[in-house]
């Protein structure tokens, strides 16, 4: 096995297995259920699924139109967290739901997985543990640059819509 660290701090491990024609790629991060806030257990696992669904380009039909809606949703969640009145919280929650449905009409569900599978990837999956989360698949060696680009995009430009959350 070869191990090295990139300038950005990313650790890379390469193990050649000449008996296999495909490459097994895995991206892991040091975050898991230990990082869940006490009141939101399961959040790391939920984020694993969210990160699997799309980016500003993968699964987004019109990110220029979607992005302001997501920013408004985030602002509404912040507003709801600060609101003490239960009736006002409920009204904000309804606004969030309406915005989420509106945004959901602008995205494609499962586009990330479909894109990976279209390049020959198999076993596209992920897992969340106590202190780490990973995403992996096997793919034809000639697709390594495409796999690296697609895999990096989920961390660089994640985007989530209502249709992604339902999937």
Which role fits each region the language model picked out?
Residues 1-107, 134-159, 166:
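His/Glu-rich zincin catalytic helix
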Residues 16, 124-128:
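Catalytic zinc-binding patch centered on the HExxH motif and its immediate surroundings
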Residues 127-131, 162-165:
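Short coil/turn segments at secondary-structure boundaries
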């Amino acid at each position: 096995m070869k191990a090295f660290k990139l300038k950005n701090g990313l650790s890379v491990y390469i193990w050649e297995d000449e008996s296999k024609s495909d490459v097994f790629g895995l991206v892991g991060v040091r975050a898991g259920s230990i990082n869940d806030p006490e009141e939101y257990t399961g959040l790391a696992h939920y984020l694993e699924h969210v990160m699997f669904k799309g980016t500003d380009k993968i699964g987004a039909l019109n990110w220029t139109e979607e992005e302001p809606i997501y920013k408004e949703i985030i602002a509404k969640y912040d507003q709801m967290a600060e609101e003490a009145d239960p009736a006002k919280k409920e009204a904000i929650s309804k606004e969030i739901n309406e915005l989420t449905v509106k945004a959901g009409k602008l995205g494609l569900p499962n586009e990330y997985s479909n894109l990976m599978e279209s390049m020959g990837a198999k076993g596209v999956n992920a897992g969340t543990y106590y202190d780490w989360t990973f995403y992996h698949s096997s793919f034809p060696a000639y697709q390594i640059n495409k796999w690296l680009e697609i895999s990096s995009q989920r961390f660089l430009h994640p985007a989530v819509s209502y249709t992604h959350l339902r999937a």
